[in-house]
Amino acid sequence: MSGDTAFYELGACTNFSFLEGAAPAEEMVVFAKKARLAGLGIADRNSVAGVVRAHAKAKMENYPFQPGARLVFADGTPDVLAYPRNRRGWGHLCRLLSAGNLRSKKGDCTLHLADLLEWQEELLLIVMPDRVRPEPESLKPLLGKLQEHAGNRLYLGLAPRYDGFDRHDFAVLATVARKAGIGLLATNDALYHDPDYRPLADVVTAIREHVPVAGAGFLLQKNAERHLKSPREMARLFSDYPEAIANTQKFFRHLAFSLDELRHQYPDENAGGETPAESLRRLVSEGAAERYPEGVPEKVQRQIEYELELINDKKYEPYFLTVHKLVKFARSEKILCQGRGSAANSSVCFCLGITDVDPQKFTLLFDRFLSKDRDEPPDIDVDFEHERREEVIQYIYRTYGKEHAGLAAAVISYRSRSAGREVAKAFGFSEDVQSALVSSIWGWGNSPFTEEQARGAGLDAADPSTRRVLAYASLLMNYPRHLSQHVGGFVITRDRLDEVVPIMNTAMPDRYMIEWDKDDLDELKILKVDVLALGMLTCLAKGFKLLEAHYGEPITLAEIYQDHQPAVYDMICRADTVGVFQIESRAQMSMLPRLQPREMYDLVIEVAIVRPGPIQGNMVHPYLKRREGQRKGEKVKYPSPELKAVLERTLGVPLFQEQAMQIAITAAGFSPSEADRLRRAMATFKRTGTIHTFERKMVEGMVANGYEREFAERCFNQIKGFGEYGFPESHAASFASLVYASAWLKTYYPDIFCAALLNAQPMGFYAPAQLVRDAREHGVKVLPVDINHSDWDALLEGEGQFRKESVDPRHADMREVIKTRKAVRLGFRLVKGLKQADMGALVACRGEGYRSVHDLWFRSGLSRSVLERLADADAFRSLGLDRRAALWAVKALDEQSAVERLPLFEGAGSLDLRAEPKVALPEMPAGEQVIHDYRTLTLSLKAHPVSFMREDFSRTGILRSRDLAATATGKWVTVAGLVLVRQRPGSANGVIFMTIEDETGIANIIVWEKTFRKYRPQVMGSRLVKIRGRLQNQSGVIHVVADHLEDITPMLGLLRREARRFGANDRADGALRPSGDAREKRKLRQLRLGLPGGAEPEGEAAAQVAEAMPKGRNFH
């Protein structure tokens, strides 16, 4: 400290004091060290969510740090800074915060003084007087009560307010402390590290208080002084109270706790007096006998012994037993589940039934999962059916209790959209301007705001207010907004979890989470079990049930994995993969005809190769070239026999993280632990840049082993190209099995596949409209939602519904393969606004069927609003009622006649079924029907919206999607359609891939970055788009490379050109009036003739139609 008084700041908070603190924990630590503070304590508001980040940074900086919390009470008690002086004290702090969390809704913590008195043991406490004006008389009884319990562990905090009254207030508080016999302690009560962050603190205050900065007044800090100050400056400020500075050192030195003391205690999973090691060995032995019924191969047995020995050395047996217990429970309940990720490298996991990939078949690397040289717990991810995962979660709570099991947190941070909107609001920008500013932002990214985006929103980029919004929105990005629950990471402990970390309620009943996220847990080496949800498992489970129920063919995933059918691979090679797991995206479909998968390992490669890692590492084209050469009989040359063993399965091109590790071990002399550090560096190099530290060792190691320097450098650059996107082979292998299973189901039973996909929504790449279209192209008859035939889920019905000639010519090869005989009846789940419980009542009361709208209303007890939704969805056709007639009948129901449902009338036979009287209503035109279908169901079985424009499109030279296959490559073409998908992969250098749809199918569009910048509003905002560009046809994969885009969404108004207005809020008994005024008709005429971009805005009718159409899904 060289002459400076030792000062320890204990009142600092971070941005984990949500919308109060204005700096990240890591930056607080770095700045504190730079400012020569002797040590730093972090005390966030009723939370320890940010302390692990500070702890990790402090260890890296070799800087003294202590975790604590600022206790803010609901009963008027002044704030108290609480710090644990040992491990027991930390447990008490966690129990105290947990008590406040569990009595509150998610995000709140309701503390009372009684909580502190109950849990104050082993805590050092600093009472912080009110910042507005200290009230000594109210402090006296509080200090007396706390001193009675805490004794010399209690201090009174002095924090300057820089308002001219500090000298007076300090004197008053010093008197109170002296009379109470407690010490004074100095703090600057820091909200941020650097005074330059004061404006950001004002912005977060305005966001928190829901007022603009300009109107926040006294809510804002009076100055920029609440930052980390140097010891010299603090000594000057407290020159009259040097003991307050000295006491910070005394206080800090009594804190002997470190977060590194937290150790995960695994639950006891002993059975029948066995030790965990004995139980695990027995279960693995039994599982191995099942996996290898003809005897366990010697190589596999050696691997099992090696893994069990390492697991025993690490004392991880209880962890494996816990995961096995969860999987065993799921299977006992017939819940489909499958382990994935690095656990698929383990033969023990395979034998326990946790994973379904035999590591010996895929040459997987166990050290990727668990290493003797790596001091960290293994990470096992298990996917469960997403609709039934809650059963597994509740089993965990029933088995272990919330005191021993909790979900990890997920830190929800500000992204571009949320930061832009909130900051613009804080600076008083109108809601329209806020929306315009964020509308051009891609997805949920966190790229800084640009002046180009501001100008695109109609703002003056040179205006000081605009510049402030851009600057502070960019600064706020990645700041935490709140804690949410992790997608499935569970921490399960033997000792009380709420003495390790505070637990809290979630937004869902009977679920509890902790305050730390997965990175915090990794830092502290606290083990979690990932209980994840996967929609495709739900789809397959429902599909298997339909297969057994309707076709009498029970089947399991394991049986499908063994059933490698050429017809399945034929379908995959044609890229006929809409709905198929992992290979349904535009990029995957483009790769399939070139890769030509013919076996399971080809699917492993397919899953992994269309990823940013292989693309950025320049591995895709070399691999495809060698695969083409292999088909021609060409041999691959390898630099050495050792590398051939590593790379032969991928034709000499490293595609997986495991191969990068094996190259380092085999060719460069790395130890397994060094190779694993290389893998970690690959995973984080974009954030930390540490991969370069391995370059010299790897290149020189390979040269020393006889490899050419140029080859060694190229090898390293390929590995570096993986970046944080490198794909583990074990993960790809786990997913490849689900690729095949879903493709198998689609190949033979497209009716089941369609129904199962619809019943597993939301999931996947495509909306229900595209799934239904694809099923119909494969000859599946799809029937509409109907009150007398539908259930909540889609059903199969009828026999002999499949006709070979109904299969689209593009899938003609499937006509002799498809085994479908059923039709798919759409389920009520597709109707917007309906509840499953209501539809359950409808089905339960249906009996022989409903005879009228009144009959349905009377017997089911459903409200009229529910019946209106059903009528809107055109679900009364079995009664002979079209949409308008059904709405008329529902509207005619007299709410007063609810008395008819009284017991007096039950079974009396006094009521007729009241068949709806015939009313002559104008027929709803086809275009209007389609609009309503999309509005209520997001799809239409009657027609595609674009079909109503085809005449106009054909006159202006717009091709159908189907016609592109017969068009010469390189030719200029114009296409138009509804925007289904926009995809902007991180590896694509700003390129956008769009998928549009017309009445004949889909067209894939490539939008280069330069074109995207020029037509950004059209790409991002169009629901119906017209595109001119050059056709590319490579190996049957067709794209249009866009040169010009035009938003023709107003043309959707053409669906109503023959219709009368019958909008979302109109009903059949409403006045039927002409559609649109002369001005609107004039616009529609202009549209039919080809409305130029940027012409008049669409009329009201066109806007209503556009609102009913899909916006398009955005993917990264």
Swiss-Prot record:
The record ties this protein, via CDD domains, to: DnaE_OBF (cd04485), PHP_PolIIIA_DnaE2 (cd07434)
Q: Which family does it belong to?
A: Belongs to the DNA polymerase type-C family. DnaE2 subfamily.
**GO aspect biological process, one term:** DNA replication
For whether the record's keyword set contains Cytoplasm, the answer is yes
Descriptive protein name: Error-prone DNA polymerase
| Sorted UniProt keywords | Cytoplasm, DNA damage, DNA repair, DNA replication, DNA-directed DNA polymerase, Nucleotidyltransferase, Transferase
Supply the source organism for this entry: Sinorhizobium medicae (strain WSM419) (Ensifer medicae)
The listed locations are: Cytoplasm
Q: What this chain does, per the record?
A: DNA polymerase involved in damage-induced mutagenesis and translesion synthesis (TLS). It is not the major replicative DNA polymerase.
Top EC category: transferase
Q: Which PANTHER family match?
A: DNA POLYMERASE III SUBUNIT ALPHA, ERROR-PRONE DNA POLYMERASE
Gene Ontology annotations for the cellular component aspect, listed alphabetically: cytoplasm
Q: Name one GO molecular function term.
A: nucleic acid binding
- What is the predominant subcellular site recorded for this chain? cytoplasm
Q: What is its EC number?
A: 2.7.7.7
| A Pfam family | DNA_pol3_finger
Name the reaction it catalyses.
DNA(n) + a 2'-deoxyribonucleoside 5'-triphosphate = DNA(n+1) + diphosphate
